[in-house]
Regions:
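Domain-level signature for proteins that mediate thiol-based redox and metal-cofactor handling
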Residues: 5-9, 32, 48, 92
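Intrinsically disordered, low-complexity linear regions
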Residues: 23-29, 67, 89
Length: 96
């Protein structure tokens, strides 16, 4: 499994933006946006730190595609749109 490190977190109107380092030897940096709506969907009780949800989304996406194939900036909802099992699997990947 590829390592995901949250380098920075920034809140904006409607959600958060995270700079992530995705690495397994060749480090790749990507920006992931997480809306409040997607956070509420994946953090069932709302008790998870937003950065943990963002990291879980990245881990999920990396189980499907390579880090270099991810766009430089992406929205977390991309996981839901592309992969029907995202809503089931992402909450299980959140590290508490």
């Amino acid at each position: 499994m590829m390592d995901v490190e949250v380098l920075s977190e920034r809140e904006f109107e409607g959600g958060w933006s995270f700079e992530l380092r995705l690495g397994d030897g060749d480090d790749v940096t990507r920006t992931l946006r997480l809306s409040w709506a997607d956070y509420d969907l994946w953090s069932n009780d709302g008790g998870d730190p937003p950065h943990a949800v963002a990291a879980a989304v990245a881990v999920f996406l990396l189980s499907r595609i390579t880090a270099s194939d991810l766009p430089a900036t992406l929205d977390a909802a991309t996981a839901r749109r592309r992969y029907p099992d995202a809503d089931e699997k992402i909450p299980k990947l959140i590290r508490r």
